Amino acid sequence: MVQQRGARAKRDGGPPPPGPGPAEEGAREPGWCKTPSGHIKRPMNAFMVWSQHERRKIMDQWPDMHNAEISKRLGRRWQLLQDSEKIPFVREAERLRLKHMADYPDYKYRPRKKSKGAPAKARPRPPGGSGGGSRLKPGPQLPGRGGRRAAGGPLGGGAAAPEDDDEDDDEELLEVRLVETPGRELWRMVPAGRAARGQAERAQGPSGEGAAAAAAASPTPSEDEEPEEEEEEAAAAEEGEEETVASGEESLGFLSRLPPGPAGLDCSALDRDPDLQPPSGTSHFEFPDYCTPEVTEMIAGDWRPSSIADLVFTY
C-alpha cells in the first residue's frame, strides 16, 4: 500500500509522502511525548516533522557537521519549499496535535522562564594615584605664599609658625588686590617698605631655631642698609599722607559744588518728634532737589493734634 502511494506521488510529480518516522513510531507508545523526568513535550509542527527525516540524511552525508550548521541549512531549505510541497507535513503535524490533545487533555504550555543573570558588577574604581585623583587640578596659589613655604621648609625643618602670620597674610592679600585692580586709591596705601621687609624676613625663614641658624649662616647686614630701609618707610608714609589729603580735598570740593537749599524749607516741625529722626543725625528731607512747594507746605504744617480732646470721639 505504501508502494502504491509512492508510485502515485511520483506520477503526480509531488514529493513522496513521509514514511513512518520516529514521531509516528513514538505515537504508538503510551508515553510517546513524555521525557524520563516526566516533562510533557509540545506536539511537533510541520517543520519539525519534515526536519526529522532531512536531518538524518544530512547527518549520514556529513557526520562531522555541527548541529547548529545543520539547523541553519534545514531552515533555508524549508523556506525554499513551495506550499504544495509542505501540505503532507502540515497534515501530519495536525494529526499529532489532535493525538496529543487526546492523550494529555490537561496539558498546558508553560515556557521556561529565562533565569535572570547576576546583576552587572560595578566597574571597579582605579586607585587614587592613577584614577580620578590625577584629574584634579590644584588651585592657583597666591604669590608669596608658595615661595614662603618653599623657602621656609628646608631651613626651619619642623619649627612652629611665627605669631605674626596673620598680619603677613593680610599684607599679602592687600598686595594681590593691588596687582589685580590698580585703579583703587584705597589699596595703594599699602606700606611698600613694610611689605618688602616682610618678604625678606619670610625668605630668610621662620623665627626660632631655623631663623637663628639662617642668621648665623648669613653675613650680618651693614649699617648702611638700615638707614636706607628707614628712608623707604618714611617716603612710603609721606606718599600715603599725601594721597589721604588729596582724597579729603576732593571730597570737600565735591561738597562745595552742591547747590544751596531753598530758604523756604522749614523742618522745625519734624524736630519736635524724636522718633522721626534717623539714628545717624541726618534726615532724608534735607535734599532740596526732590521737594516741591506743596510738599514743603505739608512738611511745615503741624501734624500732631493740639490737645488730647481731639483724639476722643463723642457720640
UniProtKB/Swiss-Prot annotation:
Its keywords, alphabetically, are: Activator, DNA-binding, Nucleus, Transcription, Transcription regulation
Spell out the Gene3D superfamilies in the cross-references.
High mobility group box domain
GO cellular component annotations of the record: chromatin; nucleoplasm; nucleus; protein-DNA complex
Q: Which PROSITE patterns match?
A: HMG_BOX_2 (PS50118)
Give the Pfam families listed for this entry.
Answer: HMG_box
Q: What's an example Gene Ontology biological process for this entry?
A: spinal cord development
Q: Where in the cell is it found?
A: Nucleus
Entry keyword Nucleus: yes
- InterPro entries in the cross-refs: HMG_box_dom, HMG_box_dom_sf, SOX-12/11/4, SRY-related_HMG-box_TF-like
What SMART domains does this protein map onto?
Answer: HMG
Entry keyword annotation includes DNA-binding? yes
Biased composition (Acidic residues) is annotated at 162-173, 222-244
Instruction: Write out the biased-composition intervals (Gly residues).
Output: 149-159
Instruction: Write out the tissue specificity statement of the associated record.
Output: Expressed most abundantly in the CNS. Expressed in the heart, pancreas, thymus, testis and ovary. Weakly expressed in brain, placenta, lung, liver, skeletal muscle, kidney, spleen, prostate, small intestine, colon, and peripheral blood lymphocytes.
The terms under GO molecular function for this entry are:
DNA binding; DNA-binding transcription activator activity, RNA polymerase II-specific; DNA-binding transcription factor activity, RNA polymerase II-specific; RNA polymerase II cis-regulatory region sequence-specific DNA binding; sequence-specific double-stranded DNA binding; transcription cis-regulatory region binding
Q: Where is the composition biased (Low complexity)?
A: 192-221
Region named Disordered: 1-40, 100-288
Region ranges (Required for transcriptional activation activity and synergistic coactivation of transcriptional activity with POU3F2): 283-315
DNA-binding region as annotated in the record: 40-108
Q: Where is the composition biased (Basic and acidic residues)?
A: 100-109, 174-187
Q: What does this protein do?
A: Transcription factor that binds to DNA at the consensus sequence 5'-ACCAAAG-3'. Acts as a transcriptional activator. Binds cooperatively with POU3F2/BRN2 or POU3F1/OCT6 to gene promoters, which enhances transcriptional activation. Involved in the differentiation of naive CD4-positive T-cells into peripherally induced regulatory T (pT reg) cells under inflammatory conditions. Binds to the promoter region of the FOXP3 gene and promotes its transcription, and might thereby contribute to pT reg cell differentiation in the spleen and lymph nodes during inflammation.
Q: Which named protein is this?
A: Transcription factor SOX-12
What organism is the protein native to?
Answer: Homo sapiens (Human)
Taxonomy of the source species: Eukaryota, Metazoa, Chordata, Craniata, Vertebrata
